[in-house]
Structures are given as structure tokens and as C-alpha cells.
Amino acid sequence: MVWFRCMRYGEAAIVLSAVLMGTVSVFVRNVGGDTLSVTFLRLFFGFLAVLPFCLRDVGRPDRTLLGLAVFNFLTVASYIAAIQSTEVAMAALLLYMAPVYVIPLSVLMGERVEVKTLLALPLGLIGLYLMLTPYAELTFGIIFGIVSGLSYAIVFVLSKEARKKHSPWRITFYNLGLGSAALLPYFLMFGRVGSWLWAIGLGVVPTAVPFVLFSYGMKYVKVQRAPILALIEPLCAGLVGYFYFGETLTLTQLIGGAMILAGVLIAWRE
């Protein structure tokens, strides 16, 4: 009973994390600056936001934490590069191909593929396709998007492993701290920013808070189920585009959004 309750909290944490991450385009478009500058600002201000909560729980990083920090950095940087190089919808679609890559990785980890996963995954991905309407040209933006999806899948797997030994605060501390430290020299020499206020918001709302929630949830949720729950992010991103940027939503997109929501509910249901 206790584990069931923890699993529910874990799933809710991942869904809430995805909702907050769905606002990232608002901040990225208002911050200004090149890809690496925006990536640094996101990681750095996120790191500062969690730092006061991590001072007593730093510890020494092991290989899992270091690997997680590397792939998390690669995911963030390649996704921002994709957003700046191609259609936002296409970048989001390629990032959220991660569930496809996660399933074989979860099998290698010894997880049994659940029936609900086999039902929820195609439903969610078809809905994602309908909602985001991809384009066929192979550009640098698409390549960055493919890289972001592959690295994001590895982030799910390594997060699950890291939570066996580390707290969400420690994981987030190294995820954000090591990434921002690696980019600090670049930012000091070449960095530029359009709005510091938006940069701070970028570090807190779609970064620090959802990163902690995501790390918490991964302890209690199966690797194969977590990225399906996270498909709620592009759905929220579409709603942000509609309400904040004034973008239109077609009937096809609305059907796609409903399919994503149905897939998430199937994955969530016990």
C-alpha cells in the first residue's frame, strides 16, 4: 500500500514536471542569445535555485551521476539548438521519440514490457505526430532533434539508476552544476543575453523545479512508463502556443492532443 502511494506520487511528479517543462519555449524566445548562451543560463540559474537545498546533500559523484549530467547537458543543448534551427513542433516531435528508444533499453535493464505500455505508446506517438505536424527535410535542426531524443532516452535510464542511491536534490545539483560549469568559460568570453529576468525564470520554472520533480518520480515509476507520462509536455507546449503566442490549433491537432492525453491516462492507470 505504501509503495502504491509512492508510485502514484512519482507518476504525478513526472506529469507535473512535464507540464512545467512545456513552458520552456516562452522563456527561450524571450531570453535571446545563441544556443550555448541560453543553455548556460538555463543550467546556471537552475543550479542557483536548487543550491540552498543541496548544501547538506552534495556527496561525491559516481559514474552514474557524471554520465547523467553529460547526457542531460546534451539533451538540453541539442533541444535548444533544434528549437532555434527548425520548427518548434518538429523539434518537440523528435525529442519525444524518446519513449521508442527507452523500451529496448528498459528490456536490457530487466523490465518486462507491460501491456499498458504497448497500448499507450503508439497512441501517444500517433497523437504527437498529429498534433505537431512534422516536416520531411533533413536539416541541422532535425539532426539536433534526433540527438536530443536519443540522449533524452538515456537520461530516463540513468535517472532510474541514479535514484537507487541518490536523492533528487543531489541528482539535480550535479545535472545543473556540471553542465553550467562546462559552459561558464564560453559564456564569459562569447555569451550574450537579451533579458536577465527571463533568464532567471528559465532557470527556475522549466528547469530547477521540474528537474527535482522528475528525479523524485523516477524512483517509483518504471523506465518504460515514465517517458509516456512525459508526453504531456508537448501537449502543454501546444496549449502555451495557443494561449501565449496566439498560435492556432487545428482539428487534427486537437485530436492528436486528445490521443496523447489518452495514452498518458492508460500509462497512469493501474
From Swiss-Prot:
Bilayer topology annotation: Multi-pass membrane protein
Cystine connections: none
Transmembrane segments: 12-32, 35-55, 64-84, 88-108, 117-137, 138-158, 171-191, 194-214, 226-246, 248-268
Membrane listed as a keyword: yes
Protein name: Uncharacterized transporter AF_1552
Superkingdom of origin: Archaea
Keyword Transferase attributed: no
The family this protein is said to belong to: Belongs to the EamA transporter family.
Major place of residence: membrane
One Gene Ontology cellular component: plasma membrane
